[in-house]
């Protein structure tokens, strides 16, 4: 057991999907995994291990924001030996060419958080995805016919930002979307020498306000990113 995860050693696979919403973790376990067993209910942050196409895979919620995903991802890596971590979550488009329900693969994650600067105040330490996972995910998504964008995202510490226009301006510099977790996940992956990737479904748009989705749709659909994430985890 770790501080926030009740699993015993061996109950978590070495590859895992990390949705922010614990109910999305439950949905993935019930709809994609065979013989799924719940290994964690602490703080209702549900985690499950099962099989996908004969491969042992886990899925666990992380909550919202970089502090929350940092707690769970670190414990999964350090205490349970997880080697491949793929975030599957939602993001808001910052780019006119990126639309609701399309996928974004975060090649890198800029951030307005001090989570990295606290350790490296003298550097702009880049938060980048595992190229191996990124390359596999891109080709899998293309083979499945999914509209997929690859590029930089913004991992923000703030959901209700007072710098709305500044965030939108980033879209003109090629930033695809804004979310709240990828930079922290990539930083931990660099620190502990594991592979990480963030796959997001666009749930709304900061540049096209008429594009949005319902809370129920965000919880129970958006299955494209789940399929890509699972296929990427088991790809040789």
Swiss-Prot record:
PROSITE patterns for the chain: PNP_UDP_1
EC number: 2.4.2.1
A GO term, aspect molecular function: purine-nucleoside phosphorylase activity
Any one cellular-component term (Gene Ontology): cytosol
Catalytic activities: a purine D-ribonucleoside + phosphate = a purine nucleobase + alpha-D-ribose 1-phosphate; a purine 2'-deoxy-D-ribonucleoside + phosphate = a purine nucleobase + 2-deoxy-alpha-D-ribose 1-phosphate
InterPro entries: DeoD-type, Nucleoside_phosphorylase_CS, Nucleoside_phosphorylase_d, Nucleoside_phosphorylase_sf
Residues holding a purine D-ribonucleoside: 4, 179-181, 203-204
Record bears the keyword Transferase: yes
EC main group: transferase
Active site: residue positions: 204
GO biological process: purine nucleoside catabolic process
Record-listed phosphate binding positions: 20, 24, 43, 87-90
Source superkingdom: Bacteria
UniProt-annotated site: Important for catalytic activity, residues: 218
Quaternary structure (record): Homohexamer; trimer of homodimers.
Biological role stated in the UniProt entry: Catalyzes the reversible phosphorolytic breakdown of the N-glycosidic bond in the beta-(deoxy)ribonucleoside molecules, with the formation of the corresponding free purine bases and pentose-1-phosphate.
Protein known as: Purine nucleoside phosphorylase DeoD-type
Species the sequence originates in: Streptococcus pneumoniae serotype 2 (strain D39 / NCTC 7466)
Higher taxonomy: Bacteria, Bacillati, Bacillota, Bacilli, Lactobacillales
